Amino acid sequence: MMNTALQKKCACRVVRLAVACAGVIVLTLTACASGPKPLDWQLEAKGAMERSVAAYLEGNARVEAVEFARAKTEVSSTGRVDLMARAELLRCASHVASLVFEPCAGFEKIRQDAPLAERAYADYLGAALQPKDAALLPPQQRLALTGGDAGVKGMSDPLSQLVAVGVAFQSGRASPAMVQLAIDAASSQGWRRPLLAWLGVQASLFDKNGLVEEAARVRRRIVLTQGDLKAPR
């Protein structure tokens, strides 16, 4: 049974622009029954950003691009650099989760005006975070940065896990256990793109260690995951 205070808290409706995945909450808007409803741009941006991230992780780059452009249009109407920075970072986080390492070009265009926390997160995604800036990271990513395998395993959000292992992989710190955690996280959500990427890493690790049968098993799983697709679109 919930106590009265918790019931009152739950009576409020929380609307997020995008998901709280990857440790980045793009925007949180709380609307209680007695308060104003979320504005149209907030709802449109939220929906488009969520669809964009989902499409990318499922392997559909075309839909991702369309939905991300829609989200940016809505966010740009506010003139707020912090919101645009977070939208760009969420997109880049989904790429890092899928082992696509490239400059976060959209964010870099507005870096000089972005808040310090967003700059730190961008550096983190590029495996270039300065130790002094670690405190600026979202709590789950700080945990992963310092906690190793246990830190990643303790993360509650699948995309946060994938991003953390992706950053560790860039830095040469990803253990076989972390790779398995990334595989499990992607598989649990049906995210084809990162699953294929991390299965490829695991197969290479088995090859490197002379584990022929294990490598062959993983490659059969890759074929199964691809289905009728030769590669993510």
Predicted regions and their residues:
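C-terminal motif of bacterial Sec signal peptides marking the signal peptidase cleavage site
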Residues: 28-31
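Extended amphipathic alpha-helical interaction segments
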Residues: 117-191
